[in-house]
A protein has these predicted regions:
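Flexible, D/E/H-enriched segments
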Residues: 1-50, 62-165, 176, 198-279
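Catalytic metal-binding/acid-base residues of hydrolase active sites
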Residues: 13, 58-60, 191-192
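Beta-strand elements within well-structured catalytic alpha/beta cores of enzymes
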Residues: 50-56, 148, 181-189
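A contiguous pocket-lining binding segment that forms or flanks enzyme active sites
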Residues: 168-175, 181-208
């Protein structure tokens, strides 16, 4: 049977891509963030996942405000990146596996998640940059990917509890796949930040650290809060942490933390990184 071997979650702000292009990884501003990936690179080299399930949000490349699904799953054999206007070079297509995607889609429908199915899907920086951070030396991403897009842009947004249940369902589906593939879960976005309005620049360090701590022993902790309460605590864009919640929920059983990094600010955002593996 298929096996989930671990989870990585990371921030995905576009300025990360600019820092990579400009070779700023060792600069005073960026080094604390990029250095957090060194133990993750070693872990990936040792464990070699075959498939990565990516929980992310779209910022207008594939979906826009006039058509924004709550949950969408890619069901293609490749996914393309495109210019978003950030000055970040587009990346080569990412490998998919439509058969794996359809197993997940069918399983979610059976569990009463009404997902949008995308047989042609563009993926933006929220998907591409985290994968580039994981495999920085690879010209093309070396793993099969399955994009699972969660709406964090157009209200109403799915609750943290709903996203937890989504991730849990995905984990159950993977565990029942008749396959010897090794799966890793990737959650992207956050942590606390707000890009506009009266609270532009808002960061809540205490909540971020409490949230990071909860991922190991109490992964449902943040589900006590409504979306409106999360916006108050982490900012309008900080609600991207619901992707982390979904990713964590996909991990079965007990987990242990291999590494965790928290660095502020990266482009007015609280930067977070975590690697958990099953015990």
């Amino acid at each position: 049977m298929a096996k989930i071997i671990g989870m990585v979650s990371t921030s995905h702000v576009p300025s990360i891509g600019s820092a990579i292009v400009k070779n700023l990884q060792d600069s005073e501003y960026w080094k604390p963030f990029f250095s957090g990936f060194k133990p993750i690179h070693q872990w990936l080299a040792n464990h070699k996942p075959d498939v990565v399930i990516v929980f992310y949000n779209d910022h207008g490349l594939n979906f826009f405000l006039d058509s924004m699904p709550t949950f969408a799953v890619g069901a293609a054999d490749h996914y393309v990146n495109d210019d978003e206007g950030w000055g970040i070079p587009t990346l080569p297509p990412f490998k998919g596996d439509a058969n794996i995607s359809w197993e997940i889609i069918n399983g979610l429908i059976e569990r009463e998640f009404d997902v949008t199915t995308c047989q042609n899907m563009k993926v933006d920086h929220a998907f591409t940059l985290p994968l580039k951070l994981l495999w920085p030396e690879s010209a093309t991403c070396p793993v099969i990917t399955v994009p699972i897009c969660i709406n964090t842009v157009q209200f109403p947004l799915p609750s943290a509890k709903r996203c937890y249940n989504l991730g849990k369902a995905v984990g159950e589906i993977i565990a029942n796949l008749d396959s010897d593939l090794k799966f890793m879960i990737l959650g992207t976005g956050g942590l606390s930040h707000q890009l506009d309005g009266e609270r532009a620049g808002f960061i809540n360090k205490k909540f971020d650290l409490d949230f990071l701590d909860s991922l190991v022993q109490n992964p449902t902790w943040a589900t006590q809060y409504s979306i409106e309460e999360l916006v108050e605590k982490v900012g309008t864009q900080g609600v991207e942490l619901i992707m982390w919640i979904a990713a964590r929920a996909a991990l079965p059983g007990q987990v242990r933390q291999i590494t965790s990094t928290y660095h502020i600010p990266i482009s007015n955002t609280a930067g977070g990184i975590v690697l958990l593996e099953n015990t």
